[in-house]
């Protein structure tokens, strides 16, 4: 019997101010776990898969049921330990300790590869937590929209004199992460052609407002893109097809996009990438019958796609890796120049990381969108002079549909995270919000990840692979009193290529929450400034001095 699949389950988080757990801290963790599996949020909820190939919220359905039951009975001086999606222990701690500590997908380095992980996964001994799937803070495609938007805005500034009008992006993948690309591109002023091999994903993104239109074929797609570019409109087009096929066809046809990237689930060649010439049904069958053949065929197709991306770069397209490790997969297949195009973090995002700026997010446990709109207004009030941020919030309200519990993503840094969260806590206390707010972030943040092919690619001092930093981040957030803390391996880029930590805290309006928020949401982004200052970035050093961070090795500079 497959205890990971239950087609009869439909999970939705409770809304409102009535709780069944013993406190809002544990009620929040329960609701966020359930929200990760809401059919409006998750990619394959019946199989516990949230996003990113096989990124799960719990190891299996018995584990899920036991986590829910345990959170309902957990006392305010107890901590639940979750090991790769399975609840393994409840221990007496104290009221300011985290209520849940999570470790997902972690393997001793020598064994940290997909082959060994897949053996353990098949035996039911592990699960892949991705980043926010197994740490219960996924908010649907909105969670990555602003980061993608910031990247596209930076590309327009660097390559097109600040204007994306009449320019278009070619990319692949419309899963939980890739699905953000078309909306982010059009928000930034680009047109976007997104290739996806699963038609249900195109339809889902159209339904949720992330894709504007579905093309019948490549010729139709290019006609739609060309017409929109000529008019100066920003249009997103979903095209059913194989990314390796379509990218290669464009090269042969001499059609050069302005921007090229990719967000297929290339990080997981077994479960995340469809080989050329294969149907979805054939791939599903082969995963059971001959997984090694699937991996081989998928990586060969990735090599074809990356060669096409390199050719488009040579033809003049601004080309970047969007963090799915496709360059590494192609390199392993003999594409020796796969890394000739850069990753998006060193190319466009790192200056933000140097100031601790990253994907801050919050969720209204009331389930009422008005609570999010009120917090949007509070952000504008507290950060009055940031026109770019205000523009983002305005666009988000108009164009982003909530998935599951209403949520907002907003890239802010060390200067602002704690004071925004404290304001939200005060709004809960005063009754301005109908229920508490959950505050967290992606693991893709300035101080919480080591990923040499993504977030820590091309660090100034060569410390790309040093993973002490996310471990220190998780330890500090635990000591600071976060509500739940997670430590994962392999998110984004796959097994053996990343380690990363997550943090979530609940603003329940209490004075105790106020104290915890002040510690956690200062210390967490401060570790990002620390990490980049230690690597020698002047922006980070200046930020550390301005914010009076105590960094012993830098204090005398």
Swiss-Prot record:
Signal peptide: none
Keywords attached to this entry: Cytoplasm, Histidine metabolism, Lyase, NAD
Top-rank lineage group of the source organism: Bacteria
Co-factor(s): NAD(+)
Residues that bind NAD(+): 52-53, 130, 176-178, 196, 201, 242-243, 263-267, 273-274, 322, 492
Its EC number(s): 4.2.1.49
Keyword NAD in record: yes
Active site: 410
Catalytic activity: 4-imidazolone-5-propanoate = trans-urocanate + H2O
Involved pathway(s): Amino-acid degradation; L-histidine degradation into L-glutamate; N-formimidoyl-L-glutamate from L-histidine: step 2/3
GO cellular component: cytoplasm
Main location: cytoplasm
GO MF, any single term: urocanate hydratase activity
Subcellular localization, as worded in the UniProt entry: Cytoplasm
Listed GO biological process terms: L-histidine catabolic process to glutamate and formamide; L-histidine catabolic process to glutamate and formate
Keyword Ribosomal protein included in the entry's annotation: no
Cofactor note (record): Binds 1 NAD(+) per subunit.
InterPro entries tied to this protein: Urocanase, Urocanase-like, Urocanase_C, Urocanase_central_sf, Urocanase_CS, Urocanase_N, Urocanase_Rossmann-like, Urocanase_sf
Role of this protein: Catalyzes the conversion of urocanate to 4-imidazolone-5-propionate.
Recorded family membership: Belongs to the urocanase family.
Protein name: Urocanate hydratase
Species this protein is from: Pseudoalteromonas translucida (strain TAC 125)
Gene: hutU
């Amino acid at each position: 019997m497959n205890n990971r699949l239950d087609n009869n389950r439909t999970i939705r988080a409770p809304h409102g101010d009535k709780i069944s757990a013993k406190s809002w801290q544990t009620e929040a963790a329960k609701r966020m776990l359930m929200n990760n599996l809401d059919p409006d949020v998750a990619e394959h909820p019946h199989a516990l898969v949230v996003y990113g190939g096989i990124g799960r919220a719990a190891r299996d359905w018995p584990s899920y049921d036991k986590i829910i039951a345990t959170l309902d009975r957990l006392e305010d001086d107890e901590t639940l330990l979750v090991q790769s999606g399975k609840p393994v222990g409840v221990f007496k701690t104290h009221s300011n300790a985290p209520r849940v500590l999570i470790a997902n997908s972690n393997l001793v380095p020598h064994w940290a590869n997909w082959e060994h992980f897949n053996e353990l996964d098949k035996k039911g001994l592990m699960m892949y937590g991705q980043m926010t799937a197994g740490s219960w803070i996924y908010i649907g495609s909105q969670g990555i929209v602003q980061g993608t938007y910031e990247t596209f805005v930076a590309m327009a500034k660097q390559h097109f004199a600040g204007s994306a009008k009449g320019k278009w992006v070619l990319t692949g993948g419309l899963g939980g992460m890739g699905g953000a690309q078309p909306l982010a591109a059009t928000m930034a002023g680009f047109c976007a052609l997104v290739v996806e091999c699963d038609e249900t994903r195109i339809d889902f993104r159209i339904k949720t407002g992330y894709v504007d239109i579905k093309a019948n074929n490549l010729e139709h797609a290019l006609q739609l893109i060309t017409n929109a570019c000529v008019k100066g409109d920003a249009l997103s087009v979903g095209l059913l097809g194989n990314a390796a096929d379509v990218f290669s066809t464009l090269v042969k046809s001499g059609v050069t996009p302005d921007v090229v990237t990719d967000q297929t689930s290339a990080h997981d060649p077994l479960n995340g990438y469809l080989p050329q010439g294969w149907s979805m049904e054939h791939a599903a069958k082969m995963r059971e019958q001959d997984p090694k053949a699937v991996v081989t065929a998928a990586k060969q197709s990735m090599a074809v796609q990356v060669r096409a991306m390199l050719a488009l770069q040579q033809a003049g397209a601004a080309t970047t890796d969007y963090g799915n490790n496709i360059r590494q997969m192609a390199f392993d297949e003999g594409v020796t120049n796969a890394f000739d195009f850069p990753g998006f973090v060193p190319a466009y995002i790192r200056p933000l990381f140097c100031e601790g700026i990253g994907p801050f997010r919050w969720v209204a446990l009331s389930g009422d969108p008005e609570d999010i709109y009120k917090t949007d207004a509070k952000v504008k009030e507290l950060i009055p002079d940031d026109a770019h941020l205000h523009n983002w919030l305005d666009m988000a309200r108009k164009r982003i549909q909530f998935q599951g519990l209403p949520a907002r993503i907003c890239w802010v840094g060390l200067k602002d995270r704690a004071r925004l969260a404290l304001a939200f806590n005060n709004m809960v206390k005063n009754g301005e919000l109908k229920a508490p707010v959950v505050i967290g972030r992606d693991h893709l943040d300035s101080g919480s990840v080591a990923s040499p092919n993504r977030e820590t690619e091309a660090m100034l001092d060569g410390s790309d692979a040093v993973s002490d930093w996310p471990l220190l981040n998780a330890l500090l957030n635990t000591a600071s009193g976060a509500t739940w803390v997670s430590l994962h391996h392999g998110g984004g880029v796959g097994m053996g290529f990343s380690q990363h930590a997550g943090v979530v805290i609940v603003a329940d309006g209490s004075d105790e929450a106020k104290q915890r928020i002040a510690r956690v949401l200062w210390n967490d982004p401060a570790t990002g400034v620390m990490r980049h200052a230690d690597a020698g970035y002047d922006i980070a050093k200046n930020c550390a001095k301005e914010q009076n961070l105590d960094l012993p090795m830098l204090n005398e500079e």
